[in-house]
Amino acid sequence: MSNEIKQIHATCIAIGDNGILLRGPTASGKSDLALRLIDAGATLIADDRVDLILGSKGVCASAPAILKGLLEVRNIGILQFPSKENAFVSLVCELVRPEEIERMPQYTNTCILGINLPHVLIAPFETSSVTKVQLALGLITGSIKLAHDKS
């Protein structure tokens, strides 16, 4: 297990103990979606840059010290929010345009630091995007099931 930190351009929030990594290009809506998730009860881990390290339970996300607790709220400013020190990443949300998402997508994984993590595409500015992130996490944690899943 390497103690090497990899810093990426992303945002990370936590729902309970589950870290959710929001990835996408500049101005794709990472901070905006994080703000709405925080409003729905999530906790900020890191905005704009996320430090990732391989830990005993998987990929652990944290904020660089200079950015701890800070979230950019476009047209308002950089604001201080309550935050968690770190969280293990349970879900990676790739922020894309709505037309890039299949109506009934196949579930995929993405590899980060040699660990395969569940990966979904999210259109961040859709009204339902916060709920979709919560539902995707529920599928991963087993708190909800797909209609065709009989297990």
PLM regions: where:
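Conserved NTP phosphate-binding and transfer environment spanning the P-loop NTPase/kinase superfamily
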Residues: 85-151
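Extreme N-terminal, non-catalytic leader segments
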Residues: 1-18, 23, 55, 139, ...
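Short solvent-exposed loop/turn micro-motifs enriched in small/polar/acidic residues
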Residues: 4-6, 45, 102-103
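Glycine-rich phosphate-binding P-loop
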Residues: 14-38
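Short, acidic/polar N-cap/turn motifs at the starts of alpha helices
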Residues: 10-12, 49, 107
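A generic local structural motif
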Residues: 7-8, 30-31, 78-80
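Conserved nucleotide-sensing/catalytic segment adjacent to the nucleotide-binding pocket
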Residues: 39, 43-97
